[in-house]
Amino acid sequence: MELWIATGNKGKLAEYKQLLRELPDLKVFSQGDIASFTPRPEDGKTFEDNARIKAKTLRAVKNNVWVLGEDAGLVVEGLNGLPGIHSARYAGPKASDSENVSKLLKMITLRPMPNKNAKFVCTTVVYTPTGEEWVFNGEMKGTIASKPAGLHGFGYDPVFIPEGQTQTLAELGTGYKSLLSHRAMALKAFLEKLQTVNP
């Protein structure tokens, strides 16, 4: 079985490959494997909108296979839900992970009584080889640390402390994240449904 993942994000792709490593019959590809692929702008208003845009764009050139589009981001209560769907571009269109993290911490400290409660949200839109659409959601609750810590993961992992933990995701490592992350939860829901149609 082929699964094509609509992402150009190397960190995200590596995470998917890690999460799917125990499925020997599954071959994972991404839009990066298509030389002429041009992604569409992510101009949706929700995570689901953007996940659908990604999946549909890839499916236009790779039909009759499984295609997965995903949008994920960090939702911070004290910032009225920001960075949200703008998580990857929070500090600007070409911002690095560290620039996005710096802006996040700055925006939180500007609040008179910072609310650091947050959650990672992931929505995946999957197209079956016959074109049926499936939608899955996952989330991970936690708080924002006062400064970055840890060397694992990507994005906001160095400042996100999962509920019940004292270390950031970047400190806890890939083993923890692959079991309990927002992405792992959404992917688990997809794989459970896949078992019902492809046992």
UniProtKB/Swiss-Prot annotation:
Quote the catalytic residue positions. Answer: D71 (proton acceptor)
The reply on keyword Nucleus is: no
**Annotated binding of substrate, by residue:** T7, G8, N9, K10, G11, K12, A72, F154, G155, Y156, D157, K177, H182, R183
Q: Which domain of life is it from?
A: Bacteria
Cofactor remark? Binds 1 Mg(2+) ion per subunit.
Keyword terms, alphabetized: Hydrolase, Magnesium, Metal-binding, Nucleotide metabolism, Nucleotide-binding
Q: Which InterPro entries does its entry note?
A: dITP/XTP_pyrophosphatase, ITPase-like_fam, RdgB/HAM1
Annotated GO biological processes are:
nucleotide metabolic process; purine nucleoside triphosphate catabolic process
Q: Binding residues for Mg(2+), per the UniProt record?
A: D71
* Cofactor(s) the record lists: Mg(2+)
Q: Does the keyword Metal-binding apply?
A: yes
Q: What class of enzyme is it?
A: hydrolase
Name of this protein: dITP/XTP pyrophosphatase
